Design a protein with these regions (language model features):
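Glycine-rich active-site loops that engage anionic ligands at enzyme catalytic sites
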Residues: 2-8, 12-254
Length: 254
């Protein structure tokens, strides 16, 4: 990876270049790429782990995303210059791992059960028709992929997973739902996710997951983190209910 000097304001990125820019009085953003890629995601994970160790008590928060890391630190204990040095050091560690047999399958493997059905996924049938597939084929394709957690947001526990097989990729709904149920498994373009709470949303709903994706009373509060791998496993209606799932909040097809 090529390295550029620390820049105090936003700058252009080039392929395979690490750029560090100021995000606020006590925060920096490290950009590794402009695209989504499993190798980049693995490097983000390694850098995040290294920064947690290197910055220790100076660190307030680390927010990794698809191809960047936001580093928020205590300005009473350190400064932009010291933190930027730590970022470059973390990147070099990631590169050393890359020179060997770099593990793009790093992170925990998390299995999430899903009740796939037109009852639990009101957009499942329409997605299948648009893709020229059967409902059964859509389900099989969706659960055949090992997804990477690329980012967490827009709500706590909302994990952006990629990449969905292009055969079942689907555009967002023209009119978003006012109410998407907690646990809804959804697709938007080549991303998939599980809604952690009831909220508005414009993704295509294909099933329901009974696993709680965010619980502030538990440690950790989420079953997944950035860099983890996720596989979905189909379960029956009865299994879904036995695991605590509920069906009464699902709105109809758009």
């Amino acid at each position: 990876m090529k390295y550029v000097k620390f820049l105090p304001r936003k700058s252009l990125m080039s392929k395979n270049t690490l750029t560090v820019t100021v995000a606020g009085e006590n925060s920096l953003i490290a950009y590794l790429s402009t695209k989504t890629d499993p190798m980049i995601a693995a490097k983000i994970q390694r850098m995040t782990e290294a920064l947690r160790v290197n910055l220790k008590s100076c660190l307030i928060d680390l927010i990794p995303s698809y191809a960047s890391i936001l580093v928020i630190y205590n300005p009473l204990l350190t400064d932009h210059f010291a933190v930027s040095k730590s970022i470059y050091a973390a990147a070099q560690l990631a590169d050393k791992a890359d020179e060997g047999a770099f593990d793009t399958a790093g992170g925990a493997l998390v299995k999430l059960p899903v009740y796939y059905d037109v009852e639990s996924g009101p957009d499942l049938a329409g997605l299948a028709v648009n893709a020229g597939l059967t409902v059964e084929q859509v389900i099989a394709i969706h659960q055949s992929v090992e997804y990477r957690v690329y980012a967490i947001g827009f709500a706590p526990g909302f994990a952006y997973l990629g990449e969905v097989d292009e055969r079942i990729a689907a555009s967002r709904l023209a009119t978003p739902r006012q109410k998407v149920p907690k646990g809804a498994v959804a697709i938007a373009d080549r991303q998939t996710a599980v809604y952690p709470a009831v909220s508005p949303g414009g993704w295509n709903l294909i099933g329901l997951c009974p696993t709680l994706m965010f619980d502030p009373n538990k440690e950790p509060s989420m079953p997944v983190k950035t860099g983890d791998r996720v596989v979905f496993e189909a379960i029956s209606r009865e299994e879904f209910i036995d695991l605590g799932g509920q069906l009464n909040d699902v709105e109809g097809q758009q």
